[in-house]
Amino acid sequence: VNKTGIINYLEDLKLIVVLPEAGNSWYVNSPFYKNRNYEDFVIKELITFVERKYRVISTRHGRSIAGLSMGGYGAIKFGLKYPNYFYLVGSFSGAFNWRQLMDRSRYSVAQSIIEAFGEKKSEHWDRNDVFVLVDSLINKVQPYFYISCGSDDEVEGLLSSNRDFVKLIQSKQIRYEYHELPGGHNWLFWDREIKNFLRLFRECNLR
């Protein structure tokens, strides 16, 4: 929150923003650690908690989800796996290429990926791969996907994986918009995109 202007961006919006702490979990249910079921936490616990505690619209039209980098991947994954839960889904510099990052990243990142997804080519991989999950959305209610990435993103393979994912969902006639804008893998880019996403949220709620 301190690295963005989100507090100011929310001044004229009637919504609650929830920022869960997920560490390096990749927002999945870990195949190794029972206390790291972050997908279940978000979908089965957090949403229910918020909707019981606050006066909100408890349908997909009252919910959106977005994230950056690892969180961008997580938001897209949740939108694909649980389309009945969300109306609008956003990803800024989404790390869709975690398979590639496992082999090419520094140890701490690679280790977090292994702990989240398991050893190579396990069943857990396909259950959490956004490229695989796209087909599960066919003939179902679909969220609207907002995807963006910096044209100068320095994480190897990340920009190309965003382009590849957009080509895939376009071929499946899934509703989306894609913005490839000047910027890197940093808060300067993400802050602008948070503002743009909230602008889209406002427009969707005025339709």
Predicted regions mapped to residue ranges:
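Non-catalytic cap/lid and distal C-terminal segments of serine-dependent acyl enzymes
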Residues: 1-207
